[in-house]
Amino acid sequence: MKLRISIAGPAAQEDALLAKITASAESLKQLLGEDAYAEELKPLEELIGELLVARGETLSTAESCTGGGIAARITSVAGSSAYFQGGIVAYANGIKQAQLSVNPADLLVHGAVSEPVVKQMAVGVRKHLKTDWAIATSGIAGPSGGSEAKPVGTVWIAVSGPG
């Protein structure tokens, strides 16, 4: 969600208007707490990079339905090599098992597009690539392949991090 605050008034009252905007922004920050991640308009991948650099932390990705799209966006940011270690595109279940340590039983019971599997993908890539953080995705992109239980458009996303 993006929120833009604007207040209009005479130019002679510019200082008073700026004070109102600042007070409104501060109230919103208190209300949103840690759910607010930026006060300026920047792409999410750039903000993630700035945060990782500031913390001295690293990131990896494990992608199925996004096919490397997240990694592409992360690496589109200048300087991303300082924090992005790499990614694994694991479309096939065998790759999920071999490269990401996904439990074959969970694939059989829950399927590749499921909470337990995507969590294991995130943990697996974080451990395999030795990063602080990992993002994993698995889903049914369509146009076919969906079911009543898992329709086209179903996506699971997991983040694995320290602690």
Task: Give a label for each model feature.
Residues 1-23:
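Terminal amphipathic helices with adjacent charged low-complexity linkers/tails
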Residues 15-163:
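Short alpha-helical segments enriched in small residues
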